């Protein structure tokens, strides 16, 4: 699935089950993911394995969209 976070967008802290792969298709320096209290700024083109059973959230304080391809 594609996950888009528009400028000013917030994905409030929540927990899911299992792990997911995030492929970063579009981002900016002000798009931040917080996982278990630690802030991350995933790099464009990066591929990340996330344990989504941990508390996580995202915020896009930038001026461009943040788009991830998420593989369940």
Question: What does each model-found stretch correspond to?
Answer:
Residues 1-7:
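A short glycine-rich, His/Asp/Glu-containing loop-to-beta-strand
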Residues 7-8, 45, 53:
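Tight coil/turn sites that cap or link beta-strands
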Residues 24-44:
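A short beta-strand-loop-beta hairpin characteristic of the jelly-roll/cupin
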Residues 12-14, 31-33, 50-62:
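Short beta-strand His + acidic residue motifs that chelate non-heme Fe in jelly-roll/DSBH
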Residues 21-24, 47-49, 63-72:
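A short hydrophobic beta-strand segment most commonly corresponding to one strand
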């Amino acid at each position: 699935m594609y996950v888009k976070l528009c400028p000013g967008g917030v994905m409030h802290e929540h927990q899911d089950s299992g792990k997911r792969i995030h492929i970063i298709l579009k981002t900016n320096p002000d798009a931040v993911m917080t996982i278990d209290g630690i802030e991350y700024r995933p790099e464009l083109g990066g591929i990340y394995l996330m344990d989504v059973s941990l508390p996580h959230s995202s915020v896009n304080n930038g001026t461009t969209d943040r788009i991830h391809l998420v593989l369940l």
